[in-house]
């Protein structure tokens, strides 16, 4: 049986930032990803990275975040995240991230949906992917082991304390047991319940099975700029660089400083659910930074977005709810004074209270970086005086996982096996129709009935 100080589930931005922080505290760390390495879904971020680097303090960023979340945020967490992000910007710059820059040479701040001051930093259209690559380089430099195509099956625990992870090595076809002092859940939320995508919610699933509770599941964040009938999603930052949105009839949809991505998505939905993105007048200084997006759109649709308008529609970007965590990323249990000992969470799988009802531009990456770093740092320090334990509980979890897989295989035959695509289609249709822009008690009950069947 392998033994690691910290096991990170999810090779996401948050997961790798957590692994780096834990490693720098002296912990032995392994990252498990259900996807292939380098394929963590970092392309579905709707904006760059928010930070108040050109302001004297982070008070305005804090206020905009609270306003964008309809005042349902955890205000202490908001202050914590908006204050700490500036040091992460300096670190990313030092590690080689190629920000768009101002005339002074420092990372340039742009306006963003939900912000009343310029504070969104980008590398063009692919900020999240570039940060993903930078963090991968830092993991390689530190010799942090990353394992792709490893599916977490269950958490091992004994008397309310984490003892390790049971996972399926999908390449070798074996079920393995990894003993650990701490586990960091850092994969994704459950946004793939609405549509196909590259996200994985295994962390939430196994945490629920282990007895954890989830928080704020009713709140979701929309990306208003997605291309219908494709998996392409565009960055809303292009709206600050000369692009405009019009309805099918030609009426322009104005974007104001008070408009968040969610509010813009609702406006498009009110206008019929589909609109047009006009990027033909994009600023000359931005053309090079968005040339990759232009190429991707043309390859998928045959349309040149710099020469003709392209159709767009809103789509779920991320679920806001998840595992309730404190400022250190510890998963709380029952009340804020008790935590599931040894279990941490960061990124899309967590719910710190930062966002309230919706995410303003750039705050998703901010939460991934700061939340991941806080979770990894605390875990790296916490495990120093802890011993490995719970070998028996892990062996029992391993036995149960093997038995469940064997039972599934033995009961599978052509007569009772449903089509995976058919099940997914029914799920997407039910969730989209009953838990989209409009919800009702009757619709939620109908969705629950369909899921039960």
Residue ranges and their predicted role:
Residues 206, 212-316, 378, 384:
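An anion/pyrophosphate-binding glycine-rich loop and adjacent beta-alpha core
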Residues 182-232, 361-378:
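Glycine-rich loop(s) and the adjacent beta-strand/alpha-helix scaffold that form part
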Residues 148-149, 153-168, 292-350:
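A glycine-rich dinucleotide-binding beta-alpha-beta segment and adjacent secondary-structure elements
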Residues 35-64, 70, 221, 225, ...:
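Conserved N-terminal glycine-rich FAD pyrophosphate-binding loop of Rossmann-like flavoproteins
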Residues 68-108:
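Rossmann-like flavin
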Residues 6-31:
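N-terminal Rossmann-like FAD-binding beta1-loop-alpha1 element of flavoenzymes
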Residues 94-174, 179-182, 186, 226-230, ...:
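Conserved redox-cofactor binding core of oxidoreductases
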